[in-house]
Regions:
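PP2C/PPM-type serine/threonine phosphatase catalytic domain
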Residues: 1-246
């Protein structure tokens, strides 16, 4: 069984998108646009995250690696945009929608997970994530007079392997997909899997609320979220897969 809790932030439409197909599920956190959001007539990030989610549904299977599944989904959307957005190939990559993502695929004996950027997964008392993105968030937390300029500067370094501060993140050309973190763990004893965006991670700093397998649609969970909602203005999304009794 799959349950979802999602809530729009205060600054823009909800750019967290989630989905599942068969034994695979994901949460995508679209990056706030810093160089415009109207190549698709407005709300480009939200529309693009939904398009990637739809493409993932077409590509998921039990044969490919999760990074390959994501890569092909990204390339599908890129191909579509190349035909619908005038001068697409002349647009700097950092001006196009980008994202963080986490994906989980559940098999009979094991659970495969993939993370790119700062979304997270919680299973059986442990957090699984792409730690390489910590330095990017740390960079953006510098005390400077112009935060917006700092964030734009950071965004321009995405998927730049030649710059010492370059980093990998989800993008339409799929360049960063292979650099995401992916592992496989034994399924035994795991009864609940939680995937969530970085906004939700900010609220769930104390993961004890998840330890006993709480239902994310339970009023206890919702009350907890509302109690700590002040910690972030970002969108918050958590997707739960319950394995017990399957």
């Amino acid at each position: 069984m799959i349950e979802v809790f999602t809530q729009e932030g205060t600054k823009h439409v909800n750019q967290d998108i989630y989905g599942w197909q068969g034994n695979t599920m994901w949460v995508i956190d679209g990056a706030t646009p810093l160089f415009g959001d109207d190549l698709l007539g407005g709300n480009d990030v939200q529309k693009t995250m939904q398009n990637i989610s739809d493409a993932l549904k077409r590509h998921v299977d039990d044969k490919q690696s999760l990074s390959n599944v994501l890569y092909h989904a990204c390339k599908d959307v890129e191909s579509e945009y190349r035909h619908t957005i005038s001068g697409y190939d002349l647009i700097e990559k950092y001006k196009l929608p980008t994202f963080a993502i986490t994906i989980v695929r559940v098999n009979n004996m094991n659970i495969e997970w993939y993370g790119l950027g700062d979304c997270e997964i919680y299973m059986h008392g442990k957090v699984y994530r792409d730690e390489s993105f910590d330095r990017v968030n740390k960079r953006n937390q510098k005390e400077v007079s112009d935060k917006f300029a700092l964030h734009r500067e950071t965004r321009m370094l995405l998927n730049d392997k030649n710059h010492p501060e370059g980093y990998w993140i989800g993008s339409l050309d799929g360049a960063g997909c292979v650099y995401g973190k992916q592992e496989s763990i034994a399924r035994e004893d795991i009864e609940n899997i939680y995937l969530y965006s970085d906004g939700m991670s900010t609220i769930l700093q104390d993961k004890s609320i998840l330890m006993d397998g709480i239902d994310v649609n339970d009023s206890v969970f919702e009350n907890y979220i509302q109690k700590y909602r002040y910690l972030t203005t970002d969108d918050i999304t958590i997707l739960q897969m319950q394995l017990k009794g399957e």
